[in-house]
Amino acid sequence: MLSEIDQKLLKIAYEEAKEGFEEGGCPIGSVLARDGKIIAQGRNQRVQKGDPIAHGEMDALRKAGRQKTYRDTVLYTSLSPCMMCSGTIVQFGITKVVIGENKSFGGNDEFIISRGVEVLIANDKNCIQLMSQFIKEKPELWLEDIAEDE
């Protein structure tokens, strides 16, 4: 069960995802927070910037800049993180990740859990609907984003 703060910050990650979708990109948004306060927020900008590493989580972390520590932060993401973003979560010692949905893409949740990260999966209907719409409307872009051929 998500706390009120978790729900609020996940909604902001969803809004970032929605904005990315409206820009013609992949609808994945993220928020990095400490003590319920936003440090930074971002969205997948692979298409917009032509940068294969510009995932939503990476965009938020870049915008956060250097932090003394990430061990007291929470990462909110509209979609389950890929292996690159999961590795970054572990590398920086982020202790909690709140995931909007892991139906469209998953598999790395267990990896970050095995590394001591608390993971909450919301199965948020808005996140699920947005990803479903994106995958239906732009299947080739989705396959490119997850590095699959078909």
Language model region names:
Residues 45-59:
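A short, polar/charged loop-to-alpha-helix boundary motif
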Residues 13, 17-20, 30, 56, ...:
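Small-residue (primarily alanine) positions within well-ordered alpha-helices
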Residues 23-27:
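Short, flexible loop/turn motifs enriched in small residues
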Residues 75-89:
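Short, thiol/selenol-centered motifs that function as redox-active sites or metal-ligating centers
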Residues 57, 61-79:
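Mobile, glycine- and charge-enriched loop segments
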Residues 1-20, 71, 87-150:
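Zinc-dependent deaminase
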Residues 28-36:
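Short beta-strand scaffold segments in enzyme catalytic cores
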